Amino acid sequence: MTGDSAGAASSLWLAYHDDLADPKSKDPVLRQSSRVCGAIGLGGQTTLDPFLLEKEIGLAAIKHPMIWKTVGATSHEHLKKNWEKYKALSTECSPITHVTKDDPPVWIRYGKPAPVPVIKGDGIHHAGFGRLLKKKCEKVGIKCHLQVAGHEQPKINNNDFLKRTFAK
């Protein structure tokens, strides 16, 4: 599974989320496992928690509408002010929430150097999202290969990751 930006977030969410299959369903599609063997994400958002993002990346990350529109808030200020209303959905939509020891490996890339805080520019694709995810994956003991332009380089490139992941 792979995706870029919000597609990366969706790919990571599916990679980490518990199986959504309903083995008792009459619908054969709903009986199928939703688990994947791995994911590649490019510039993906790993959390929608505005407080964590502001602390770890800066205000530029939470000002992007993807962070607050995803959960139905009208602005980043509205999201923070009414956090209790949006917290459950924000948490559910965040891939990092679902990381557990039984999850597949992922390979993620962020194409720009990552100053913190973001002074101006594209905070929604900041490498801090990847660093947060890698830290969580290391904590639970699963593979997260992180590439950040001009900084972190994984021991395996994305093509070799795909070959190894699908060879299993």
What is the predicted function of each stretch?
Residues 20, 50-98, 104, 125:
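Mobile cap/lid helix-loop segments that gate and shape the active-site cleft of serine hydrolases
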Residues 33-37, 100-106, 140-142:
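Short, proline-enriched alpha-helix->beta-strand connector loops that line the catalytic pocket
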Residues 34, 61-62, 128, 132:
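A general alpha-helical scaffold signature found inside nucleotide-binding enzyme cores
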